[in-house]
Amino acid sequence: MSIKIAIDAMGGDHGIKVTVPASLEALSKFSDISIVLVGNQPLIEAELANHKYDKNRLSVEHAEQIVEMDDLPSKALRNKRKSSMRIALNLVKDDVAQACVSAGNTGALMAVSKFVLKTLPGIDRPAICTQMPTMKGHVHVLDLGANVGADGQSLAQFAVMGSVLAQAVDSNSRPRVGLLNIGEEEIKGHQRIKDANEILKSSDAINYVGYVEGDEIFKGDVDVVSCDGFDGNVALKASEGVAKMISFYLRAAFNKNLLTKLAGLVVYPVLKAFKAKVDPRRYNGASFLGLRKIVIKSHGGADVFSFYHAIAEARLEVNKNVPELIATEVKAILETH
């Protein structure tokens, strides 16, 4: 199967300086994909001139406009119809491409994606989902900011979508799914969390294990965590901050004097493995779950390594037919309510 991925080449903080080389890296790693770079054609072709690549597997689609990182979603929808983001999504809508990857404005990308691609039947709100490292591997957490104040029905839908994604990309036939809460007791939490808990307990569609607290996200005892967008975004940013703090203190400790520097050389392979494990760049590529087609959001400040991983995530989800699987599972759980 040949997969075509539409890249919003102008999106993000670094634009074509990141998206073009990352796309070429993906082409070199995956023989089953082709890429269409959407954006300012003269600028993209000037950047491509600095690289060697298979011209049969890469094309350029010109776009006159760019969705800026500070553009309101409404502006992106109404006034940026010829933007690289909008055209890339249109290519997916028209089945020219099977997935879109963008490092652009998150709010704008979600709004335009919902307008162009629409949501799956039974899905009220799409959710942003990404992987976070744990003691035993990784966990899929959603929502990460698209939905603040999600109701119980939406939280239950997030749980189902996250479970489907974990089954597909991790080959996990029965992923353990939890609801983020301030305690494990039934009486704790907002009413919407309690409502989602009741919905999920009454269904056999997923392997629901109950409430999980914030510290349990990283233990590796659950594979999926469903939460409100506000809570999820705070958890994600806090985990990234803690990883940076630990790295800072480790560097400071091993650079203290000659003896600690020598000790650092001895344990360098261990530290390198640790850094790779918690490096957020490896987990770049958040899925917009609940849409009819695949959209992957890269971090706005992504470097080439990070953006490459977002493209790899898009390829994986196309291969696994994630939207179709989500539609089937959501239908099953809705039929019980």
Curated annotation (Swiss-Prot):
The keyword Membrane does not apply. It comes from the Bacteria. It is found in: Cytoplasm. Its EC number is 2.3.1.274. Its main location: cytoplasm. GO terms for cellular component: cytoplasm. HAMAP family: PlsX. Homodimer. Probably interacts with PlsY. Belongs to the PlsX family. Catalyzes the reversible formation of acyl-phosphate (acyl-PO(4)) from acyl-[acyl-carrier-protein] (acyl-ACP). This enzyme utilizes acyl-ACP as fatty acyl donor, but not acyl-CoA. This is Phosphate acyltransferase. The gene is plsX.
